[in-house]
Amino acid sequence: MLKGKVVGTIVSTNKLEQLVGFKFLEVRIIENDVLTDKYIVAVDKAVSAGIGEEVLVTTGSSARMATGCPTSPVDAVIVGVVDKA
């Protein structure tokens, strides 16, 4: 699992049927509480993350399972928003 910060949205008007209803977000990876120069695109189907929020991202086969459609062509899914204490 990765920690990151949502830095942007990606709009896709044409996409595979399995991806309809998914929100695409650009996430900047955080390592050791420091923003890195690494970015990924992750889908958000359930947590409604927004720009500026820190999120938890799962990748690989776990990401496909998290979408509810194990055959979806998804590599990264936002599974949680990090609460600030």
Predicted ranges, named:
Residues S48, V55-A85:
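C-terminal structural segments of small proteins and small subunits
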Residues Q18-E26:
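Short aromatic-glycine-enriched beta-strand elements
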Residues M1-N14, V81-V82:
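Structural detector for short beta-strands of small beta-barrel domains
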Residues L25-I29, V41-V43, L56-T58:
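Short, acidic/hydrophobic/Gly-rich beta-strand patch recurrent on exposed beta strands
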Residues D33-I40:
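Short, structured beta-strand/loop micro-motifs enriched in basic residues and often containing a Trp
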